[in-house]
Amino acid sequence: MAVKRDYYEVLGVQRNASQDEIKKAFRRLARQYHPDVNKAPDAEAKFKEINEAYEVLSDPEKRSMYDRFGHAGPTAAPGFDPFSSADPFSSIFETFFGGTMRGSQRGPQRGADLRYTLSISFEEAVFGVEKTIEFRRLETCPACRGSGAEPGTEPVRCPKCGGLGEIRQRAPLFNMVTVTTCDMCRGEGTVIAIPCRECRGEGRVRQTRKITVRVPPGVDNSSQIRISGEGDAGPRGGPYGNLYVVIDVQPHPYFIREGNDIILELPLNVAQAALGVEVEVPTIDGTEHLRIPPGVQSGAVFRIRGKGVPFLRSSGRGDQIVVVRVVIPTNLTDHQRRLFEELARSLEKEPIGGQRDEGFFGRIKNALGL
């Protein structure tokens, strides 16, 4: 069994210290070692030791007996109970630091956040759009204003916990206190005597809400837009949570987004690729004139600047990347076959091979600067 330290040593005062000195020393140490403030493993044990020393030295009768008989003296003093039902942690903070140190700090609780998936087109994601959405949420009951009590009545103090919102129990053999949330009032400290007929005592009712959401230009798929105060109402009149609108961008028939660039695959036949061609290329803004030089290879990349997606947090736009795809015919007419055979004979003396092709995806990466 551990030997108890001298109470004067515990508080760090002389044996002839005045009551004022003892009180100041205790207050300083209580602030330092209270378990709600100090998270050190031994803080609770030190705090109990400090509390026990102060309980003896602050009482003239107990102090006198302690000075005469040591630790055996105070335990024999009338009315002294080291396992008192009072909670030393809360009583000390109530006495010296104001208010109470309760395990469940009651007050308005914020409502839950909500999520809403908003589907928009590729063009709407590029240029931005305003959409009206409709969703269900919990709102503060207009009849009882969130109290849960029938209008004209008020919640009453919980008879089980006396309004504390928690139940405290002291172990019979140890100076330890267990704190549990009151199961009658669920930690609120009050109960509804006459429930509101509108919300059945819940303080909230589920309602349909309709709002307009502004989607900024350049928003990407799976982006979230936070709308403050549009979530569920908090219980008992607590503040509303937030609404998070998750953007779902629908795929485009032929545009593909890569960051702030838009990729378009441009099919050309063999003759167009060999001889070159001028084409009208679709962009997100309309059509653009593009000249394809003779001898272009499949996978060649052309850039149309400023025709991509707007930057979300700065000015300017990305580019449109046009990727050439040479289409080889599969069903030739007799005339076309003869022409290709003649072309093949004329190309027999041309060298095969040459510079190594970097491939389709390599060209895309180079065009995007990756």
UniProtKB/Swiss-Prot annotation:
Record PROSITE patterns: DNAJ_1 (PS00636), DNAJ_2 (PS50076), ZF_CR (PS51188)
CDD domains: DnaJ, DnaJ_C, DnaJ_zf
Binding-site positions, Zn(2+) 1: 141, 144, 196, 199
UniProt keywords, alphabetically: Chaperone, Cytoplasm, DNA replication, Metal-binding, Repeat, Stress response, Zinc, Zinc-finger
TM segment ranges: none
Subcellular location: Cytoplasm
PANTHER family for the chain: CHAPERONE PROTEIN DNAJ, DNAJ HOMOLOG 1, MITOCHONDRIAL-RELATED
Name used for this protein in its record: Chaperone protein DnaJ
Species this protein is from: Roseiflexus sp. (strain RS-1)
Gene coding for it: dnaJ
